[in-house]
Amino acid sequence: MTLTMNEAIQLILDFRYVPVGYWKDIPIEDPLVCQFIKEGYATLDAEHQEKYVLSDKGADFLHTYIERISTTFIEFLKKKQLSCHDTDAIHWFSETYSLDNETSESLYDYISFNLKVYGYKRQKFHQTEYGWGCQFEKIDE
């Protein structure tokens, strides 16, 4: 399965961001999600058989895209001395991946929380008229 970055972002947010997955009893109209499930990237949850969640295969598959997005975002942060406002980061996601504001905000929330996997963490330190100021810092692995 080959995805555009925007398709990958959609699936990342569908399967990695709240609410995670798709309910079995609600018809899935999105052909991309149907294909993703059909190819075994998502399966019914072992505990809750009524919901499709990522399989190990799907997690590995999406990780490639998550890593690419995270690495690119870290480079953006390094150019800003690891400090920026939420609104700047959301705008960056919007511009970089041609996303609407809501999708950009969700992706920023997910990626910035997940940066600990790549050795960084986010700390909100003050609120201004431009949003929360955030400091990202390198953490020991």
Identify the role of each PLM range.
Residues W23-E39, N101-Y110:
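Short amphipathic alpha-helical interaction segments
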Residues M1-P31, R68-W92:
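Short amphipathic alpha-helical interface segments
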Residues E47-T64, T128:
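Accessory beta->alpha helical hairpin/"wing" motif in late/C-terminal subdomains of nucleic-acid enzymes
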